[in-house]
Amino acid sequence: MNPMNPMKPALPPAPHGDGSFAYESVPWQQSATQPAGSLSVVTTVWGVGNATQSQVLGNPMGPAGSPPGGSMMPGVAGGSSALTSPQCLGQQAFAEGGASKSYVQQGVYGRGSYPGGSSFTTGYAGGPAGLGLPTHAARPSTDFTQAAAAAAMAAAAATATATATATVAALQEKQSQELSQYGAMGTGQSFNSQFLQHGGPRGPSVPPGMNPSGMGGMMGPSGLSSMAMTPTRAAGMTPLYAGQRLPQHGYPGPPQGQPLPRQGIKRAYSEVYPGQQYLQGGQYAANTAQYAPGPGQPPGPASSYAGHRLPLQQGMAQSLSAPGPTGLHYKPTEQFNGQGASFNGGSISYSQPGLSGPSRSIPGYPSSPLPGNPTPPMTPSSNVPYMSPSQEVKSPFLPDLKPGLSSLHPSPSASVHCDELRLTFPVRDGVVLEPFRLQHNLAVSNHVFQLRDSVYKTLMLRPDLELQFKCYHHEDRQMNTNWPASVQVSVNATPLSIERGDNKTSHKPLYLKHVCQPGRNTIQITVTACCCSHLFVLQLVHRPSVRSVLQGLLKKRLLPAEHCITKIKRNFSSGTIPGTPGPNGEDGVEQTAIKVSLKCPITFRRIQLPARGHDCRHIQCFDLESYLQLNCERGTWRCPVCNKTALLEGLEVDQYMLGILIYIQNSDYEEITIDPTCSWKPVPVKPDLHIKEEPDGPVLKRCRTVSPAHVLMPSVMEMIAALGPGAAPFAPLQPPSAPTPSDYPSQGSNFMGPGTFPESFPSATPTTPNLAEFTQGPPPISYQSDIPSSLLTPDKSTPCLPGQMAPAGHLDPAHNPGPPGLHTPNLGPTPGTQLHHPNPSPASRQPLGQPNTGPISELAFNPASGMMGPPSMTGAGEASEPALDLLPELTNPDELLSYLGPPDLPTNSSDDLLSLFENN
């Protein structure tokens, strides 16, 4: 039995079983499917004169005469070359009689009839292991001692004069081959077997059948006939595999019929060979990197196993990359064919996707990341890494992926987590570097500031705190960001990209905390032209998410329905309602009804949370979240209906309009009419005039985090229904019960019992009921709005979850559990400051106790709240904490929008935020 080719007539074996492979000639197999436009050049070099053993050509790289990992010839690392394992003569598989007949070849690592060592047969169902054929051990390296010199000579000659086969075909033929090279296979396709040199360093070979150019009876992209590919390992992997024997294994594949995500993959292995099942193989030896994916994981693309090789010589096996959007275009299909009776050389052909048409992304080995499939790393190596044509050195351990420029160079202003939109407010006493000018004609200037460790940790843990660095014109009272074209900024030797936008109003500031470090920090400003007209400033800013601000407004600025109705009646009695013309277009007195649109004037979509400014005299509302998003970057804070100033702290959420929107939320009405008695009815939509709405307003992120039905009490909805047309009775909502952590998984909820808001929001007019009276709870407790202490408590905003709200700015450490060790030691109980408002509430102020202190290790995850916080909070002021009853989903009611306070609020020198920073 000839174990090396069990399907061929047995030949008399040599003493070591290699006699049949010594100088057996293999003719050139011209494929009938070779394109007419192909060109093949084959060069054969003679001169191998001393072949003492048959292994000289069958295994030209016998490494016994070379130390493990040593290089026997220039350009080849550790005994590897283009002829690492040339096609053993006679071992090419030729499909005879179509796809129904195939020769079963020896496995990839199989050698045969050598005692000792471990076998390296693959686990294909069509291979020897799958047919129950005996596996064979690898030959000991000592058998190659006498052939070392001849092997080196043969390999050197073969490598130096390796044949180059280039294929240039027409564009359509090229694309046709690439698209059909997988689908043309039959279930009985032959699997080619190749052989590595024995006893020498071993690397990952190309499994037969996995290379589109190495499949028997099939045309590869190079246009060559059915020549089996030689498994070529990377030269850089030589030292790691020197002297090792690898265990038997098989390349893993997905289970039969399992779909494989197509990311640059033409077809999954199980689809290419429906009748063949790849075994779930293991990995290489334990001290090597894992090449095969774990069981159950889909393998990489077929071309990846053949596509990732190191260059043999700069001019011979250079990696070829065609320009393309992403991924690798390096797809060498190294094919070795026995040419003649005494030279087992071969030609190396490279398929260049970019030669004759648009490039096609072909990922290299390791494969491109697939969902659920970690990219297997390449084996570490001390030799030269893979070199691209642009001479960029790429790590041999990492996949050669080319992400977009945006991911390679993220904008420093992109500090928004989870795509959350954030508002930006200056912090009182938060200026780190006072506004300064650059010296005239000074090209490079350095500006140093210090960050204490505690402040740095707080900045890192609080996503709503940032260090903002911006430039503005010295005459701009609003200090709008404006970067001169010649300004470049780097922080701690890290260059930052400045977003200047299309016009001067779209310039964005830089946010530096991601490049800062504890202690000394240096901002370097480089200019090529004079910028004396501009000022630079570094300040601490509070950047609450839109979600948290939205929640705070819902809790503090939700005007009761009675208030809204009173306001509407008063406007009717006065005879004028600006901005809302009557049905006949008249704005005069004695209006019978007012037509109000249910669409937001910003987005032209159905309003979700109706709001307007405190000074607005119209009933028409805008969508609150859209308004906040509109003012994120450069807030003008003007009402889109009447263009009056509508600052954040003066916004009002109209509970009356909200009830109407909830009542008709499942209808297509676009307008309603409201009469002087506040009775309302929808305006029927005319079918001939109804056009599907297209949002032609600003493109805003729609991240609805509020369930409006939970904002209104059943009595309010009953009142809305009574004032409505009465077409269908409104089913009242169930009274909200006291919230529990399991019922409302909101962040940081510590309020379990019935109660009311910590402080009633200042009412718009002294005669209208405020929010605390509307909630019908116990008297409100005082609220302590202190910005410096709030900046030392962690933000609890989390990614957007349906029906879940993030709290607003966390302002009171006693009410906000957070990392206790982050509070500044010198901060004691601080008196609260009050928002400037036309009619402030005369609630008394009770300073609360000092926040809890303790190591950061006390942090624990509370599954009920979904946030990190101390296991138990027993600080002062917690025992009498009231809870919400009106808004069960909205927790942390102690957080008023106090971060909106102007910088001239009363300050306390003991907790001046500026003391947290050390300026030079």
Curated annotation (Swiss-Prot):
Location of Omega-N-methylarginine modifications: 111
GO biological process, one term: positive regulation of transcription by RNA polymerase II
Annotated keywords: Isopeptide bond, Metal-binding, Methylation, Nucleus, Ubl conjugation, Zinc, Zinc-finger
Region of interest (Interaction with AR), ranges: 435-506
Compositional bias segments (type: Pro residues): 366-379
Keyword Zinc-finger among UniProt keywords: yes
Subcellular location: Nucleus
Start-end of Polar residues biased regions: 334-354, 782-796, 842-855, 906-920
A single GO molecular function term of this UniProt record: transcription coactivator activity
Residues found modified as Asymmetric dimethylarginine: 245, 262
Zn finger region (SP-RING-type): 585-671
Crosslinked residue numbers (Glycyl lysine isopeptide (Lys-Gly) (interchain with G-Cter in SUMO2)): 402, 457, 692
Residue segments, region Disordered: 1-22, 243-262, 289-308, 317-408, 732-920
Record: residues binding Zn(2+): 616, 618, 639, 642
Keyword match Metal-binding: yes
Highest taxon of source: Eukaryota
GO CC term, one of those recorded: nuclear replication fork
Subunit and interaction comment: Interacts with AR, SMARCA4/BRG1 and SMARCE1/BAF57. Interaction with either SMARCA4 and SMARCE1 enhances AR-mediated transcription.
Cited function: Increases ligand-dependent transcriptional activity of AR and other nuclear hormone receptors.
This protein's name: Zinc finger MIZ domain-containing protein 2
Organism: Mus musculus
Designated gene of the protein: Zmiz2
